[in-house]
């Protein structure tokens, strides 16, 4: 840390930047660390520290979560696989068509989300002879000429149960998994109007699952983005590299309706220039929302 102090002082002075070198502080200084612990203790005494789980941007190359503002500093246009997967309903011979741009999250699927007021149609795919539910507005994206068997609202699908595509966490049914839920964030702008829910890898997914009081939760990916042994077929594989194998699995099990490639803007780690993933992180958090109004009021007093 101290090796290039003189060179640093010389360079900063030459470029005309003002820095108070003689009264600086470093985060490695013991007195500075003590001050941080003091602040933490004050927050603890006020009941503003809690232990919880939050879905956060994760740098798998560094093995550490990033702050949200860090995650927005390095977006890149990339190509990713997108798949439409068929989930069979428990009590009928129909399937739910679900679209996702993160195939690697499918082994962790615990629910499917619809929009209460969205119209869904039941159609019969002539190629597979399967009856499939998808949003009425999205049918033309998948089929040129198709017969509509039935039209319902999303609310009619809520609480219907379906069979998991992957077997790894089938026991989670006892905790309320593999059921259709609803939420206002579901749209028909893209995909099928049915959204795959993997609460360990999506902020909305976790929020919706919790709102229904479902306790099921699985996270078979470590901090370096590799599948754990729970997902036996892909154990040890980096999640992005596993996409191809997962798609092959879906094809082999007749669960794949469509495979495509999309181009979109995706967050990268600003330090390592590698793709970020979003993952549930158990940690200690500050209840900022409890005093957010005080922060805003204080800001308004600043000239």
Which role does the model predict for each range below?
Residues 1-107, 159, 185, 189-303:
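Residue patterns forming the tRNA-binding/recognition surfaces of aminoacyl-tRNA synthetases
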Residues 108-222:
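Catalytic alpha/beta core of large soluble enzyme barrels
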């Amino acid at each position: 840390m101290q090796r290039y102090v003189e060179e640093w002082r010389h360079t900063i002075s030459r470029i005309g930047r003002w820095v108070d070198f003689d009264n600086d502080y470093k985060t490695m200084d013991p007195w500075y660390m003590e001050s941080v612990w003091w602040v933490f203790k004050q927050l603890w005494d006020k009941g503003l520290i809690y232990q919880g789980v939050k879905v956060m941007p994760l740098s798998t190359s560094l093995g550490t979560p990033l702050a949200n503002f860090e995650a927005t500093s390095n977006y890149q246009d990339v190509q990713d696989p997108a798949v439409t997967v068929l989930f069979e309903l428990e009590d009928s011979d129909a399937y739910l068509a679900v679209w996702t741009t993160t195939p690697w999250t499918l082994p962790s699927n615990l629910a499917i989300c619809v929009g209460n007021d969205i119209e869904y149609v039941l159609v019969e795919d002539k190629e597979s002879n399967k009856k499939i539910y998808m949003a009425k507005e999205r049918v033309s994206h998948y089929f040129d000429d198709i017969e509509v068997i039935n039209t319902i609202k999303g609310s009619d699908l809520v609480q219907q149960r379906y069979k998991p595509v992957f077997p790894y966490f089938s026991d989670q049914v006892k905790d309320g998994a593999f059921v259709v839920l609803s939420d206002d964030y579901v749209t028909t702008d893209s995909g099928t109007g049915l959204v795959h829910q993997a609460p360990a890898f999506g902020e909305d997914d976790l929020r919706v699952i919790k709102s229904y009081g479902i306790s099921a939760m699985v996270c078979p990916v470590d901090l370096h983005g590799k599948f754990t042994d729970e997902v036996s077929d892909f154990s040890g594989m980096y999640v992005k590299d596993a996409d191809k194998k997962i798609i092959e699995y879906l094809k082999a099990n007749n669960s794949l309706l469509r495979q495509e490639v999309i181009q979109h803007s995706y967050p990268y780690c600003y330090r390592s220039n590698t793709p970020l993933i979003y993952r549930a992180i158990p940690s200690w958090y500050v209840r900022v929302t409890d005093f957010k109004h005080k922060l805003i009021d204080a800001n308004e007093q600043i000239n």
